[in-house]
């Protein structure tokens, strides 16, 4: 059972996996959105980006202003992709563990949000500083209804072993960390 690991120690679980066919489809859904968006913002560079692919995007990212062209709103998968993901067996496994669930609409787009990140190697501005997601919720970005529990699912799409940019501090969710908002 993954719930004791998530709610207690260490605060996360890596017990759930995605079947290779579904993982490939998830990559395709993200790639299609990535490629489609690049066609709108940098049509003159699409060929170069396609040569690199999303997994080597960083090799051509100098051609655009990465920091300004990839806000979260353009990385939220379209409804048809979310509907397809909802039918995947790994989502069924999540429902087996947690019961039926909603995927949150944190940015008020009017539907369930599944989004992806695009982080380049050795680019410190592509990642946020160490933080607790609950801080954002405490400050009013997204809400969790009283009768709900929030569970965050992170899936590495293109990751080099040992070089993953995602860091989780075990048991950090059990502590009250001091913080302050910076506007």
Functional labels for PLM-detected ranges:
Residues 85, 89, 110-111, 148, ...:
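Residues forming well-ordered secondary-structure scaffolds
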Residues 18, 120, 157-159:
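Non-catalytic surface loops within mature trypsin-like serine protease
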Residues 16, 118-120, 170:
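Pocket-edge structural micro-motifs
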Residues 103-121:
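Active-site cores enriched in adjacent His and Asp/Glu residues with nearby glycine-rich loops
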Residues 1-107:
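N-terminal auxiliary "cap/dimerization" subdomain that precedes the catalytic jelly-roll/cupin core
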